[in-house]
């Protein structure tokens, strides 16, 4: 089968790797354009772009897929299917109709639960015990197409988004090949829209100590390594934490000499791994040995 692959993030790479190593032919790879990154603001290719280059697969990075010229290019490829995995761009309606088998998406959730841009993060944040991968047909609605294949896996009690993404991306690549190898005879099933939930992309990563500590711990795992708080006027990233029940102190107060912090609902947050501004991650005891500020209250913005 001849396919076009569309993806951008690290999650996309294993799917492309499975495709390149299979009997199927990858005609071209579509990915987001290089962007400035790092302290030097050097133009940096997406992980998918770099992997495709290393395997001599043609790469395109259009700013939009809606132009007539891009449509001509895709139609000339005459793909049997277009494979999408964490691409980050919306496909126009005409593209869904170009391939013989349409556009097939690798989605990291058990659809219809967690449609949208951040399904893995929301599975962790909501305390889901199980998640998985869905191989589905794309249609004009957000992650609402028919399902070809779905597999589940438990979420580890301390598993963060990095570890979960690595596992699900590998699952997705393997599952996709199973679908492509049997696409002529495989039947799809429609989703139950009544069970749909939506995973919006997060935008706020500052710890709110009014929340319960167990919820904050799930935030830390779901949005790793982005969650942070302010201590003595300086930003500190929170990379790993535990929680327990204890009431009595004011919310935001430090309750012992290990920087355990009173949170909402009679809970306490116990930071384990933190990262001060412009420094490397360290365990909480190492951090406190080198800290010279005031730690009586962390509710500083």
Curated annotation (Swiss-Prot):
Disulfide bonds: none annotated. It catalyses: L-methionyl-tRNA(fMet) + (6R)-10-formyltetrahydrofolate = N-formyl-L-methionyl-tRNA(fMet) + (6S)-5,6,7,8-tetrahydrofolate + H(+). (6S)-5,6,7,8-tetrahydrofolate binds at residues 109-112. It is an enzyme of class 2 (transferase). GO terms for molecular function: methionyl-tRNA formyltransferase activity. Keywords: Protein biosynthesis, Transferase. Coiled coil: none annotated. Belongs to the Fmt family. Attaches a formyl group to the free amino group of methionyl-tRNA(fMet). The formyl group appears to play a dual role in the initiator identity of N-formylmethionyl-tRNA by promoting its recognition by IF2 and preventing the misappropriation of this tRNA by the elongation apparatus. This is Methionyl-tRNA formyltransferase. It comes from Anaplasma marginale (strain St. Maries).
């Amino acid at each position: 089968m001849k396919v076009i692959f569309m993806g951008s993030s690290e999650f996309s790479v294993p799917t492309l790797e499975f495709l390149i190593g299979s009997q199927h032919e990858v005609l071209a790879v579509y990915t987001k354009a290089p962007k400035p990154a790092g302290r030097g603001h050097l133009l940096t290719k997406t992980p998918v772009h770099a992997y495709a280059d290393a395997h001599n697969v043609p790469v395109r990075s259009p700013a939009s897929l809606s132009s007539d010229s891009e449509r001509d290019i895709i139609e000339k490829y005459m793909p049997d299917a277009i494979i999408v995995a964490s691409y980050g761009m919306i496909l126009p309606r005409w593209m869904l109709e170009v391939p013989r088998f349409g556009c097939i998406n690798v989605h990291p959730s058990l659809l219809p639960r967690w449609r949208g841009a951040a399904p893995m993060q929301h599975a962790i944040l909501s305390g889901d015990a199980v998640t998985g991968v869905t191989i589905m047909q794309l249609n004009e609605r957000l992650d609402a197409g028919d399902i070809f294949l779905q597999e589940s896996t438990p979420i580890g009690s301390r598993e963060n988004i990095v570890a979960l993404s690595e596992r699900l991306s590998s699952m997705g690549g393997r599952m996709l090949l199973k679908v492509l190898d049997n696409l002529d005879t495989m039947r799809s099933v429609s989703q139950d829209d009544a069970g749909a939930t939506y995973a919006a992309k997060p935008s706020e990563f500052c710890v709110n100590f009014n929340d319960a500590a167990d919820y904050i711990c799930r935030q830390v795992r779901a949005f790793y390594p982005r969650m942070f708080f302010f201590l003595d006027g300086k930003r500190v990233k929170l990379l790993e934490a535990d929680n327990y029940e204890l009431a009595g102190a004011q919310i935001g107060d430090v309750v012992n000499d290990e920087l355990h912090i009173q949170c909402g609902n009679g809970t306490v947050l116990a930071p384990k791994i933190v990262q001060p501004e412009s420094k490397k991650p360290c365990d909480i005891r190492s951090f406190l040995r080198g800290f010279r500020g005031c730690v009586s209250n962390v509710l500083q913005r």
